[in-house]
């Protein structure tokens, strides 16, 4: 059987903001004053978050997901590779997914190649290597013109993968990274190299680049419905164009989930940290308020026409996750799934059955959620949601995608 792969994703949000943050600050990104960092309240915060992820390994999640952001309260992982390094020593089975490093921000992508190779060895071959261009905030923070980012990204990915697979030293004469000596030590443990994942937002250009290289496409969206199924169909068509066959494991999605003993208890426990996350952490990212700081012509790769349309659109249109006014609106768009094990299992199965995406990257911790609540949600999910989800999805995928059985036979030979 080939069941869904269930990953635990942690964003490591800053949980110690003043209650009036939304009233007094224009954004949680780029310009958010770092005087709000409370040293004493934040003592041990990284240890708590790392331990939550390590708990995911104990519970049997297939992987643990990290990502890179800069100068914000949404995610405190300026270097996800540091967190990944800690996890290599605290976990045994789960894949460690860095989704993603942002090589366009760096002078030399070989640093990413070397660190990923180290992590693959330190984890005994459990690394999944993610690469991304970065968003508008990163363009501002690192003063990297976003229109150049995509060219830098794909040259960097190709160079990193070649450094893992080709014998060195060799020279690389790329337009962005001309290098006389490419000869990394160590090589990754996995052969030919760790699996590569690349995020995208349904642009055909990104899908094309991912598909022709045979990588996994991660749909970078927090709203799910018909759009996710449409994206999967689009990617399948692009893969077919490149003589490849789509399976659910060629694509991944982000889901946000909270599980408790009943629907009522789940809402009561999750409501405060969820609104903290939406109102504060998404301000300037997935919320119209503050968005102009990190979204504009050329940021990220935004055309002037798209920017004008954004400015002229009525505020009721183009609503993002952080613009939600009510709990009913959140539930209607399937952005955050909150409920009893039965409710969560039913909703996730409906999503998997419709979208037929095999890598589910699940956020369990929101904003300022207490450690004990995040752990309870993870445990209930692992014990009372995951078994049926794996069983039913395995049957579905094997029936709908016979190529999976063929791949299994090839691996056994």
What spans do the regions from the language model cover?
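N-terminal beta1-alpha1-beta2 module of alpha/beta enzyme domains
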Residues: 1-95, 193-194, 400-404, 412-413
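An alpha-helical appendage that flanks or caps ligand/catalytic pockets
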Residues: 2, 8-37, 150-185, 226-355, ...
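Hydrophobic faces of well-ordered beta-strands that scaffold small-molecule active sites
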Residues: 6-10, 64-66, 96-100, 127-131, ...
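Active-site mouth loops of central-metabolism enzymes
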Residues: 32-47, 100-110, 192-202, 257-260, ...
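Conserved, mostly hydrophobic/aromatic
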Residues: 56, 68, 87, 119, ...
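Acidic (Asp/Glu)-rich catalytic clusters
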Residues: 57-58, 84-93, 116, 120-127, ...
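Glycine-rich, proline-tolerant flexible connector loops at the mouths of alpha/beta enzymes
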Residues: 65-83, 102-103, 222-225, 362-374
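A conserved active-site cap/scaffold subdomain adjacent to cofactor or substrate pockets
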Residues: 202-232, 236
